[in-house]
Amino acid sequence: MAMELFVLSDTQLNSMDEWQAAIDRERFPLRLNSETPISALKGFLPASLRGNATGFECGHSPVEVFVRGRPRASFDRAWRYVLTFRWGGDFRELESAWMAAAAYAKATGGVIFDDEEGKTHTVAEALEIVQDIERSMPKVKELLRDIKRV
């Protein structure tokens, strides 16, 4: 099952270098592949998290399509841009998508919509979620090791 996040904003970053700088300002251990121009993002975006290969699907979406696809969601205002993040069940993909989305939202003055929860998060809330994910990773890894032993 794929999960999705969306960054809603009124501005866009101009380059992958600009996005990476936003990630670096948050001191996230995430490196995005900078070969694809940010304006051409569509599909899987390779990344490295703490030196391990990972990534997530990422692309620009029309605002109208995004809003129309969520009739029960209420947004406090109209936004100009939507950047979509999608990943499967891999925990590194989850963590890297949240880090990348939080940094992008902060750099563009945007917010994050979590499709699973049907909830909009401020940048501050998104940064807390990233910290929660980072704190839970050792427990998740231990649980997965225990499952493999059984």
Where are the model-predicted features located?
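Acidic (Asp/Glu-rich) sequence patches and key acidic residues
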Residues: 1-150
